[in-house]
Amino acid sequence: MAEHIIVTLDGPAGVGKTTLARNIAEELGIAYMDTGAMFRSIGWKLGNVVESVPPAEIEKKLAGFRFSLSGAGAATQLSLNGTPVGDEIRTEEVALLASAVATLPVVRTFLKKTQQKLGSEVSLVAEGRDMGTVIFPAARYKFFLDATPEERARRRYEQLTAAGETPDLKALTDQIRKRDHQDRSRVVAPLRPADDAIIIDTTELDVQGVFAAIMSKLK
């Protein structure tokens, strides 16, 4: 795609943003930016001491972090300081750490600058919580995906079960509700759709249905 383009996909955990963003980026032949993975990476690196560490100390640590993107579509690779980000960040514990660091202004400021820089360099599909409201408010195409907590927990349950784990559905539902509360009630960049975003409820839709709905708006 010769034209520089940014597509934003926002929404809570478990609505299928990651799969859809990859598929859309693949279809358009542009990069995919997993901003949730960026927050997870920072949470994983900083650990659960974020609440007890002064912002100035966290800022010093962040100064040593460098995110980069390579490739396009489903093959897009996010790296931190030259090392590819892998499955080590895809645990429920790291997810809660990510939500915790997302409340810190120093972290959000750092990632905002990082993400906007990446977006100025390449066309991309950006998925996260505030892509259309804070990071890329001027993006031409903005989407907000949602689904009930129960449906999102069910999807996560199936993912973990397929991976050979033995998750607890009630615990997953409780974790999702907790993350929803953290994400929607935080003072800094709370989870909400942009005023000009197209809102899609994915509760009763499969990935192909949501993909088709989004692509129809991009053509």
Curated annotation (Swiss-Prot):
GO CC field: cytoplasm
Keyword Secreted attached: no
Reaction catalysed by this enzyme: CMP + ATP = CDP + ADP; dCMP + ATP = dCDP + ADP
Enzyme Commission designation: 2.7.4.25
Subcellular localization(s) per the UniProt record: Cytoplasm
InterPro entries in UniProt: Cytidylate_kin (IPR003136), Cytidylate_kinase_dom (IPR011994), P-loop_NTPase (IPR027417)
Keywords assigned: ATP-binding, Cytoplasm, Kinase, Nucleotide-binding, Transferase
Positions that bind ATP: G11, P12, A13, G14, V15, G16, K17, T18, T19
The protein, known as: Cytidylate kinase
Gene that encodes it: cmk
